């Protein structure tokens, strides 16, 4: 396991980003950003004709709170699915046609953000990165 010491991670951070577009115009892009107090990410894939956009974004706080949103935008509109363990969220209420998945908050949190550590995000299959 990892040992966590706040002085060791204070101010430490890392980020990566990517963007690709083929000759037709299909694209994907994304970034990961993390530091001792949390991290954020975003990924998106879209076709050349604007017919569909699929993506996800999210954040993690040092205290263990997480929010991950996966979405699809197409001719049917924008549809989002929110996965979170944040206090005050209620999965029985569906705000603006958005599905909220409330997880149990962790009782103990053992560390900060570790660059390169996997935090439960599943990128759409088209990305080929995970």
From Swiss-Prot:
Hydrolase listed as a keyword: no
This protein's UniProt keywords: Cuticle
Domain Chitin-binding type R&R: 24-90
This protein's GO CC annotations: chitin-based extracellular matrix
Residue ranges that the Swiss-Prot or TrEMBL entry lists as coiled coil: none
InterPro entries: CHIT_BIND_RR_consensus, Cuticle_Struct_Prot, Insect_cuticle
One Pfam family hit: Chitin_bind_4
Cell membrane listed as a keyword: no
Domain of life: Eukaryota
PROSITE patterns: CHIT_BIND_RR_1, CHIT_BIND_RR_2
GO molecular function terms listed in the Swiss-Prot or TrEMBL record: structural constituent of chitin-based larval cuticle
Protein name: Cuticle protein 14 isoform b
Upper taxonomic lineage: Eukaryota, Metazoa, Ecdysozoa, Arthropoda, Chelicerata
């Amino acid at each position: 396991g990892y040992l966590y010491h706040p002085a060791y991670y204070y101010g430490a951070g890392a980020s990566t980003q990517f963007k690709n577009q083929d000759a037709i115009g299909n694209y994907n892009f994304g970034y990961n950003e993390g530091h001792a107090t949390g991290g954020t990410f975003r990924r998106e894939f879209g076709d050349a004709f604007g017919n569909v956009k699929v993506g996800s974004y999210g954040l993690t706080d040092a205290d263990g709170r997480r929010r991950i949103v996966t979405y699809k935008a197409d001719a049917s509109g924008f549809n989002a699915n929110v996965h979170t363990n944040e206090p005050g969220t209620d999965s029985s209420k569906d705000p603006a046609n958005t599905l909220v998945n409330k997880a149990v908050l962790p009782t103990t949190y053992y560390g900060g953000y570790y660059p390169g550590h996997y935090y439960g995000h599943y990128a759409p299959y088209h990305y080929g990165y995970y």
